[in-house]
């Protein structure tokens, strides 16, 4: 079919050398030179492929993958606190019931039930979630600080600003993350150190990897409807006929 939003290529594997050779053989330099922007996740191999094949294009790290790295670090803090609490409970006198808070839950329950709430904006919280998080933040301020920075990062990505302005705001945000001094943010710090230019490229045109992620979802649904894939070549053939 061709046109906007269609599948251009389906290549097995993630080995950069193999994929680079396939793409360069399929497209001449004049075609590849026309590509101005490539969005991808934080995979080093995907970034290498994009920069080697489409040498004239800006490589952009998908903002949602960047936010996911930070959100995972926040969740690791929650898990660590809960793990310590469970260890303390195991060493405590079992005849004494655990403390319940004003919402009727124990801290162990509050921590377990806050996972998804900590990924949401405050304006989307229900009253039950709001009460739960109020207690959580009161007794574990590190989670409040981490959550506040998660929302600040989201606001930066949502802002209609230039890459230069974004760099200034990101630098201040990064300093705040460093100031928390929590080991769970090592992956976040490493990500921003290694990928700062490609993360900031998002603010050129605000392109995301959403279309590719949506296509992945379609493939998974299609695969489940077929109850799995026995003949891979025929499955790829059908995908090409449907989406190419």
Which residues fall in each region the model found?
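Short conserved beta-strand segments at catalytic cores or DNA/RNA-binding microdomains
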Residues: 1-12, 24
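Structural motif
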Residues: 16-24
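Short alpha-helix plus adjacent loop in nuclease-associated cores
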Residues: 66-87
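Short, flexible loop segments at the rims of nucleotide/cofactor-binding pockets, characterized by
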Residues: 13-17, 37
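Acidic/histidine-rich catalytic cores and adjacent linkers
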Residues: 4, 25-56, 60, 64-67, ...
């Amino acid at each position: 079919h061709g046109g906007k939003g269609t599948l251009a290529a389906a290549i097995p594997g993630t080995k950069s050398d193999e994929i680079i050779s396939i793409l360069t053989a399929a497209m001449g330099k004049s075609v590849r030179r026309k590509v101005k922007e490539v969005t991808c996740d934080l995979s080093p191999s995907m970034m290498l492929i994009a920069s080697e094949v489409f040498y004239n294009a800006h490589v952009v790290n998908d903002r949602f993958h960047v936010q996911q790295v930070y959100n995972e670090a926040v969740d690791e803090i929650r898990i660590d606190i809960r793990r310590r609490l469970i260890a303390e409970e195991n060493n405590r006198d079992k005849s004494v019931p655990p403390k319940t808070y004003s919402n009727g839950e124990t801290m162990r329950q509050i921590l377990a039930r806050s996972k998804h709430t900590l990924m949401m904006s405050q304006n989307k919280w229900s009253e039950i979630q709001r009460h739960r998080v109020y207690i959580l933040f009161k007794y574990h301020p590190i989670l409040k600080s981490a959550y506040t920075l998660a929302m600040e990062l989201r606001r930066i990505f949502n802002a209609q600003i230039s890459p230069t302005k974004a760099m200034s705001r990101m630098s201040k945000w990064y300093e705040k993350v460093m100031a928390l001094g929590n080991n769970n943010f090592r992956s976040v710090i490493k990500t921003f150190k290694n990928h700062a230019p490609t993360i900031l490229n998002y603010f050129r045109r605000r392109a995301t990897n959403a279309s590719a992620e949506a296509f992945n979802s379609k493939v998974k649904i299609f695969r489940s409807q077929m109850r799995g894939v026995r003949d891979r070549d025929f499955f790829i053939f059908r995908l090409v006929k449907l989406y190419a």
